[in-house]
């Protein structure tokens, strides 16, 4: 019962005109999380071009450079409010779109490798998973504790 009431609360806050409902759910969770005092130092931007996070592309292979310059985007980028530096990237992986699509899995792998090269922390949230809010809070707490 409490599970369905939580879903109804989220559903009531959703914009039904969005392309991906899974990303809209994460957006709502981020809004809730950042209202908490311990996380109010963070802000997020949705749909950021990966290229915009990289100061330079020197570390990238030619394939990675092409990928980045071909409008590769990130679902959510969490920034520190104070200095606007990137704290965390969140990618929402829809099961149908990702698991059943070898090309998309390859793009996800390349994105992971690029984020790792530039030491940008990231969190992948599969839409067939659960406990997203807790996973996000754990990732943010790790940033605060470091």
Where do the model's predicted regions map?
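Nucleic-acid endo/exonuclease domains
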Residues: 1-146
């Amino acid at each position: 019962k409490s599970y369905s009431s939580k879903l109804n609360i989220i559903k009531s806050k959703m914009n039904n005109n969005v392309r991906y409902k899974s990303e809209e759910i994460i957006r709502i969770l981020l809004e809730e999380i950042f209202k908490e005092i311990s996380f109010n130092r963070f802000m997020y931007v949705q749909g950021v071009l990966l290229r915009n996070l990289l100061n330079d592309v020197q570390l990238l292979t030619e394939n990675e450079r092409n990928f980045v310059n071909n409008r590769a985007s990130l679902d959510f980028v969490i920034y520190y409010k104070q200095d606007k530096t990137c704290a965390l990237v969140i990618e929402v992986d829809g099961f149908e779109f990702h698991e059943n699509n070898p090309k998309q899995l390859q793009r996800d792998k390349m994105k992971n490798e690029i984020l790792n090269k530039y030491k940008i922390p990231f969190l992948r949230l599969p839409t067939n998973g659960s406990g997203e809010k807790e996973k996000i809070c754990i990732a943010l707490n790790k940033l605060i504790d470091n």
